Amino acid sequence: MKKNHFLQELSISATQKRNGANNSKNDVLKIQSWLNLFELVNSGSGTLTSIDGDFGPATEKAVMNFQKAQGIIQNGVVDAAVFKLLCSPLQTAFETIPTGNGLRQRIINAGKLHVENFPHELIIKNKSNSGPWVRSYMDGLEGTDMFWCMGFVQAIIDQAASSLNKNFKDLMPSSFSCDVVGEEALAKGLLTRFAKVRDDPSVVKPGDIFLLQATPHDWTHTGIIVSVGNDVFETVEGNTNNDGSNNGDRACKRIRNFRKQKLDVFSIEPLV
């Protein structure tokens, strides 16, 4: 994969524990982030704690609650094995080789796999769009202005393309900007405007990318089309929510009515 920052999210430099001599603020931040992400999926697990880089009694107890949930020794210490359990959703999402007949099906399957592992942003140091999932999609970047929907899309396409020894950069520029990608699609003749999509939905194929149009040269959100119906696309999207926001807090599978929304479509056919 070309987008491989996720590898840095899968390990810590040394065992971390309360008052540990080898404690690293960066490692503790990772641990606290995953403890919070675990609680989002496992409500009531008791692993919510501050994300401040300090391995104090609260973090120790949160680790013990995580260890209890996993059925392992409850000592409050995070070694390599415990951290591997903490970050296992991200490892599963990024390191599972997509399967399927051809690139389009592999893109769809990779997208679904990521969503099933619940990619979710966190608020760290009062900044949204933060945490290990966001950094993985955004090549290490995070923070309030780091809208990560395009990073999510490109990570999925990269993962699927790499499984077939293809380079996603042959299709589109490596950019987190919907506008940059949209203009490239226009220049290559790969962008079908929403009006034509409404007239003839058959021009759209699963695995293609939608770009939500604000104006003809301004796009505010993106995602991968999983299936096409008469009126709707089923999609997988990052940085969204149940309302379809372009700055939500998670990746999810959605249904969008392309007859009511201005959804331009970027064809991935040249990479197929």
Regions found by a protein language model. Give the residues of each.
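Short, basic amphipathic alpha-helical segments that act as recognition/interaction helices
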Residues: 83-89
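Acidic, glycine-anchored loop motifs typical of Ca2+
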Residues: 50-53, 76, 217
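Low-complexity, Gly/Ser/Thr/Pro-rich intrinsically disordered linker/tail segments
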Residues: 248-272
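Acidic, Ser/Thr/Pro/Gly-enriched interdomain connector segments
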Residues: 1-53, 93-105, 114-116
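...with weaker cross-activation on analogous glycine-rich loops/strands in unrelated enzymes
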Residues: 163-245
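Conserved hydrophobic/aromatic packing and binding residues within compact polymer-binding modules
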Residues: 63-66
